[in-house]
Amino acid sequence: MAEYGREPCPFRIVEDCGGAFAMGALGGGAFQAIKGFRNAPSGLGYRLSGGLAAVRARSGLVGGNFAVWGATFSAIDCSLVYFRKKEDPWNAIISGATTGGILAARTGLTSMLSSALVGGALLALIEGVGIVVSHYSADSYRQVSPVERQQRYKQELLRQQKGVSPLAATYGEIDSSAL
């Protein structure tokens, strides 16, 4: 599964680090703006300035944390691509687990293991959803043979002659063998 829209590996680390920083800074900025707005004294002016102060104080830190996660994840992912000589979902799952473990290493072994488990499970979930979506969406781009197209056309004509709606036949409300 090659991703042709991505940079090659050494540059991918920098690209992912920057993208993660931007995502963390914007998302963290929005979250901090809401938090600062809610925690400020009453009055619209105070609330707006409180929200802006919270954004200035914390959004860069959140963006930096996201950037560290993105750079670590990409470095491990590129290392796995180099050593395994293939790019598949297992690289992302292993990278997520390893990144979670590395970033939680200062807090102790149990926290490190639980963060690695959460990182691996989260990336497995993301990769699994991506595989399922690509599997089902690929079927809509499948080429239909002329014989199959003719069979579908005949079935549609029979449905129209019998007065059966296409939705009823599609969703199993009627036995298609009776047509």
From Swiss-Prot:
It is found in: Mitochondrion inner membrane. The keyword Cell inner membrane does not apply. Keywords: Membrane, Mitochondrion, Mitochondrion inner membrane, Protein transport, Translocation, Transmembrane, Transmembrane helix, Transport. GO terms for biological process: protein import into mitochondrial matrix; protein insertion into mitochondrial inner membrane. It comes from the Eukaryota. It is a multi-pass membrane protein. GO terms for cellular component: mitochondrial inner membrane; TIM23 mitochondrial import inner membrane translocase complex. Signal peptide: none annotated. The chain crosses the membrane at residues 17-37, 61-81, 113-133. Pfam families: Tim17. The keyword Zinc does not apply. Essential component of the TIM23 complex, a complex that mediates the translocation of transit peptide-containing proteins across the mitochondrial inner membrane. Belongs to the Tim17/Tim22/Tim23 family. Component of the TIM23 complex at least composed of Tim23, Tim17 (Tim17a1, Tim17a2 or Tim17b1) and a Tim50. The complex interacts with the Tim44 component of the PAM complex. This is Probable mitochondrial import inner membrane translocase subunit Tim17 1. It comes from Drosophila melanogaster.
